[in-house]
Regions:
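A residue-level signal for conserved active-site and pocket-lining positions in enzyme catalytic cores
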Residues: 36, 78, 88, 131, ...
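Compact, charge-rich alpha-helical regulatory domains located at protein termini
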Residues: 48, 162, 180-262, 454
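Short Gly/Ser/Thr- and Asp/Glu-enriched loop/turn motifs at secondary-structure junctions
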Residues: 128-132, 169-172, 311-315, 366-370
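Structured, non-catalytic alpha/beta "coupling" segments that mediate domain-domain communication
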Residues: 153, 157-180, 257, 369
DNA sequence: TCTGGGGTCCTAGGACCC
DNA sequence: TCTGGGGTCCTAGGACCC
């Protein structure tokens, strides 16, 4: 596969720097932004509990296994990302650190607010993750750019209620670099702009190569073997070297470092290739009936996600895993693909196939830690193949679709799991360990009532 | 005591065909 | 008897992201 600067974005380039071996650009037609919320999950907790701003607090992963977000004060106290809870429990108690369970329904709604707010400042917004957005500016004034950046940060932080940082630069990768610099920047304005040749070079010279978007631990180790330690070191390698020693993704990264845009904006998110729901059990389980209920729950959730995205699947994967960290216990990991007779997103169909798979891979006598269901080979609902089917199957499909529709409308109105399939269950052993869940301040009326009274 | 969950992209290599 | 070599398709697994 050949790497070419994106054809549309190619038009941005107007002048090429004559000096140096490579392409370094002096002027750009368009500008990219990367906005991200600082300590997003913790920040959203502070919004409705203002006293938290003066207390150390963290947000925990499911089952309170590790830290996934830290408040400013917790960061200053030395609490790190992904630290295991069991190592920290005593210290946290001593330091008075509050540990919140994660509440993704609430975070998603806050993320939507951020997206809508930021959209008013640029031509295209792309949701990159729950707490990051890419922006594209088709027109801007070079001298006024820093001031525009500060205005976006000020207005969004105030309007949404959670602090943001912004990086502005001529490619997505450089915008990521600028954003990281903004987080560390001592001037506290929350913005870094990289738009001249000199600014970009200076930034890359001080930027560790392992912090680049797309360079993980494996590449970092490989690059250090070649004495490549900074982003500038990598950018100064000849293209053929990158081609020979790395992948096409790295080649794109190399172009982007040099100001040639290769990673286009994705205004409309592409259709998903697969959808997965999986959970670790709070405590290991070997009982088949309990695992069957968990798999039914996950399969129901996959079917719901499919319907929400207007997709059908043609195959279901089930997997079952023992606790990989308990190396002294006997291990068993397995998965299986079960093909569907026809495309479907109906809960009963997906669940029955998932259970068929589970029965095939379940072995008695193991302490299982995690199970999950994945739906694969996804196609849009609009691709109908009913004409090719036997009448009986077509009829069954229609019945299942109606049933799922009824299920969705009841559950959307009265809350998740108001109506369930018989195979599902919410036994105590299957419940997540989430002792300190914050209210869904923005999405659930009963929770909203709580805060207005309290 | 416990170590998340949900994704994408790319490459290598096997199977198969001509 | 020789057994090359180009092409496609599929899958497992690695690497990376938040």
């Amino acid at each position: 596969m050949q790497v070419q600067p994106d054809s549309e974005l190619d038009n941005y380039l107007t002048e090429i720097s004559p000096e140096n071996s490579g392409i370094w650009l002096l002027k750009y037609r368009y500008m990219f932004g990367l906005a991200d919320f600082s300590s997003f999950y913790c920040g959203t907790h502070e919004l409705f509990e203002p006293k938290l701003r003066f207390l150390p607090h963290v947000t925990m992963s499911n089952n309170h296994g590790c830290i996934i977000s830290r408040s400013k004060i917790a960061k200053q106290m030395g609490y790190g990302m992904s630290q295991n809870a069991f190592e920290l429990v005593k210290q946290m108690k001593k330091d008075g650190v509050i540990d919140y369970s994660s509440n993704y329904e609430y975070y998603q709604s806050m993320s939507n607010r951020g997206f809508n707010h930021v959209a008013q400042f640029c031509d295209i917004v792309e949701r990159y993750s729950i707490d990051e957005l890419f922006m594209l500016f088709k027109q801007w004034d070079q001298d006024a750019l820093p001031a525009l950046g500060r205005e976006i940060v000020r207005s969004t932080t105030k309007g949404v209620g959670v602090e943001i940082c912004l990086g502005l630069a001529p490619t997505k990768l450089l915008a990521k670099v600028a954003n990281k610099m903004a987080k560390k920047s001592p001037d506290k304005s929350g913005v870094v702009v990289l738009q001249t040749d000199a600014q970009i070079r200076a930034a890359l010279q001080d930027f560790p190569v392992e912090d680049l978007w797309g360079i993980g631990p494996a590449y970092a180790k490989f690059l250090s073997g070649w004495n490549i330690y900074t982003a500038l070191d990598l950018a100064m390698q000849p293209e053929y070297w990158v081609k020979q020693n790395m992948t096409v993704q790295s080649q794109r990264l190399w172009y982007e470092l040099r100001g040639v845009s290769c990673v286009p904006m994705e205004e409309i998110p592409p259709d998903k290739k697969h959808i997965c729901t999986s959970r670790s059990f709070a405590k290991t389980i070997d009982d088949f009936d309990l695992i069957l209920k968990a798999v039914s729950n996950h399969a129901t959730s996959c079917a719901y996600k499919l319907r929400k995205d207007k997709l059908n699947c043609t195959a279901v994967v089930v997997f079952l895993q023992t606790d990989k960290f308990r190396t002294e216990q006997k291990q068993y990991n397995n998965d299986i693909v079960i093909k569907l007779d026809v495309y479907s997103n109906a809960a009963r169909v997906i669940v029955s196939k998932a259970l068929e798979g589970l029965r095939k891979i379940y072995r008695k006598g193991y302490a299982y830690k995690k199970t999950g269901v994945m739906v694969i080979d996804l196609i849009p609902e609009s691709h109908q193949q009913t004409a090719l089917l036997f009448e009986e199957k077509t009829h069954n499909m229609e019945v299942e679709a109606k049933l799922s529709k009824a299920l969705d409308s009841i559950n959307n109105r009265y809350g998740r799991n108001t109506v369930q399939l018989g195979a599902q269950g919410n036994d105590k052993q299957l419940q997540l360990n989430a002792p300190n869940l914050c209210p869904c301040y923005t999405t659930r009326i009963e929770d909203i009532m709580k805060i207005s009274i309290g």
